[in-house]
Amino acid sequence: RPVQETLEKVALEAGRKLDPKVSLALLMADAATGEIVAEVGAANYFDASRSGWIDMTRAERSPGSALKPFIYGLAFEQGLVAQETIVEDRPADFFGYRPKNFDMHYQGDVSIRQALQLSLNVPAVRLLDAVGPSRLMVRLRRAGVTLKLPPNEAPGLAIALGGAGITLKDLVQLYAGLANREQPVRLGDGIRDKAELIDEESLFEPTAAWTVADVLGDVLPPTGSPPAGIAYKTGTSYGYRDAWSVGYDGRYVLGVWIGRPDNAAVPGISGYQTAAPILFEAFTKSGLAGTALPRAPAGANRIAASELPQSLRRFSVDPNGLVSVSARERPPQIVYPLEGSVLELGKSADGKALPVVMKMQAGRAPFRWLVNGKPMSESTRRRTGEWHPEGTGQSTLTVIDAEGRAASVNVFVRN
């Protein structure tokens, strides 16, 4: 397998330039079929200092900013923004969550296109707040991928910046869903997994998928790397524990991960400076590069800012010109547990029953939680609550906001 051997050599050479305890992994797949054409789980399998025997293509890690394209894809699909829509990159408070940019600086007014290319954090969180973290999770499942959330945590805005776990294999599978506009694929090497088409709708409608590729395809290659004709995104996890870069052309997808298998910090690594050069080298040396990114579907094109309808010229601005957090204008929504969930009663180490943590978004504080129509507690400004089920069976959970708007879910509790 010449591609496999080539990527193994790329990984070995790249590993020699990294700290002795830092490993890396690469995975390349055919976006049309799901076939894994090359998979390298470590810089050097026989290197004990790097725990080379651990296959890091299957290890769950924080993706940093690598999921941002999927947030933007949903926003494009829902018609919330266009490439030249202006969004604010300034300090913002999302009900206690205060994201900061990687370089601790803010750009002010930027276009959506610039925000994604520069991987700005605040605009990404603004968009995720608008499309909804739960809706993003559901959409990613179209591509056969379920993000790993912390125990008892509901999907939240931190997902935009890496607040969920994913493997390199699954991340490449998601990007294959971007590259293949027709049908998602499940990656497989024919040994551990079977490559197959997923019987689902396309990950995004064609115009949204093209728009994401059009933006990412114009991101400059890392310094010293020649253009490879790919759309790509990088990611750096909190605390410099993971560096990622994933890219795709019209046929193949390649992902790179760098970090320590023991999850210790690696000061100085970043997706752009550390992982992206390896991505470009591997893509070029694979001999598979060269399939142009798909052309724009009918009716899809870049629209100049001056030609945008008024509603798309600036994102999340109220009639007074003040930036508004979109959640304040939407009715309340229970994001955990979800409708129809089956909840298992857990116990702590001392044998006490653990509460069910409930989480909601949007609405206007204060809020009141009810179970089967009975209030559980006094009104609260928090968007989380705890419920101690009195037994098993079906229950209806409800939250009511200050405007009297309510949201309910039916759940089933079992031992």
Where are these regions (language model features)?
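Second-shell loop/turn segments in exported
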Residues: 1, 53-61, 99-103, 111, ...
